[in-house]
Amino acid sequence: MGMKINAELPLPAELKAEYPLSEEILRIKEKRDREIRDIFTGKSDKFIVIVGPCSADNEESVCEYVSRLAAVNDRVSDRLMLIPRIYTNKPRTTGEGYKGMLHQPEPDREPNLLEGIIAIRRLHTRAIRESGLTAADEMLYPENRSYLDDILSYEAVGARSVENQQHRLTASSMDIPVGMKNPTSGDFSVMLNSVKAAQSSHRFIYRGMDVTTDGNDLAHVILRGGVDKYSKCIPNYHYEDLIRLLDMYRNRDLKNPAAIVDANHSNSDKQFKEQIRIVSEVLHSRNYNTELKGLIKGVMIESYLEEGCQRIDENRVYGKSITDPCLGWEDTERLIYKIAEEC
């Protein structure tokens, strides 16, 4: 047999009972969820900034980052909705490399999924408690989101997962916004089809149960660029791309048309400093066209305490990415204030 059982994992309800949320955290989440919903339904004109490390690799540095973000939030909350990006599981192009805190609570040690599910719940809970900001994470494994579904205020379905039926159907069960990224090919139709699926009701098997979902009216798109058959990056944040997306939304019966622009990945060709320019161009396009201003609800930025990235070894720099390169804190802070002025 090609698979062995390493450990029996607790059910989500059991983990939640062991690591419960305080009444204060529940109040924070309820308030922020309501404010974020108002942005996606058009009741609020605040601009969303989903910002944080490529991967949440260390509890201390991530919580320090989020606490710094909270201080910035105090100055921009009248214009912006800051959502910390706390990604605890990472898709890998070849399946090799660091797969996130869920797999490896300590990046330089062997995977331990039992310790991992505890570590990610503890991290998200601590981040909210210390900052007052609920976070975004990626739904890489649909069944595992049940360990965090009472904590998160935003989830994303990645470029390699967006065509997968289980991801689409699970997204239809969420009561928070879920961003469906364009696939690595860059195909807008595939992306919008995934939004349609996520907004619809479905009956399917989930964690050993026969379930029926209501559909998620806050499902929307995330533009992250694509690659052609020669692996050359194809950005999709330019004005013409946004107008094309607007036209395609018009031709589909979708609720609450909305888009988030991911300033990194194939939009920047992983040239992390380009995120500053890309965000500026997106803001210019929104301000130039009132319909785009209604469609483009926010941006996604990869940033950490220290800029760039590093290899996993014993001499790691605190607060520096061990996956894709990120903006450093000083650039991030300046960029957020600039967004608040221009959005």
Residue map of PLM features:
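Active-site-facing alpha/beta catalytic cores
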Residues: 66, 79-244, 265-266, 270, ...
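Conserved phosphate/anionic-ligand binding catalytic regions in large, soluble enzymes, centered on
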Residues: 48-61, 324
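N- or domain-start disorder-to-order transition segments that initiate the globular core
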Residues: 1-41
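Short acidic, Gly/Ser-rich segments with clustered Asp/Glu that frequently serve as metal-coordination loops
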Residues: 54-57, 256, 264-270
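Conserved, mostly hydrophobic/aromatic
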Residues: 52, 261, 328
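N-terminal beta-rich core of secreted/periplasmic extracellular enzymes
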Residues: 25-39, 72-83, 89, 113, ...
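Acidic (Asp/Glu)-rich catalytic clusters
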Residues: 40-43, 70-77, 126-130, 213, ...
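Internal helix-turn-beta structural module
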Residues: 304-343
